[in-house]
Amino acid sequence: SGVVTLENGLLYRVLKKGKGKIPAGNDTVQVHYTGRLIDGTIFDRSPQGVGITFKLRGVIRGWREALQLMREGAHWEVVLPPGLAYGRRGSGEKIGPNQTLVFEIELIEVRN
């Protein structure tokens, strides 16, 4: 319960509400995350205690859309259908074509 489904197929569940800024399309963000396949297999995660920093415009569509709904300090579980993730091409050896992906994302900081 508590799962929100958007028109584009993105699903999210708020694990912790944030109180800070909401990122816009050109912003840089710092996040902690864990990426899983639908069967629970972890395929990627941010370095412990540091997170990763990136420009919003440089990541997959589902991440851009989810992060622009989150506030700094928020911690969400996000489910991305293939069209919002890596689609038909997949990514590397770990993410096959047309895979639904599950991410836990904590938005640490937003920088303009």
Which role fits each region the language model picked out?
Residues 1-112:
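Cross-family detector of peptidyl-prolyl cis-trans isomerase
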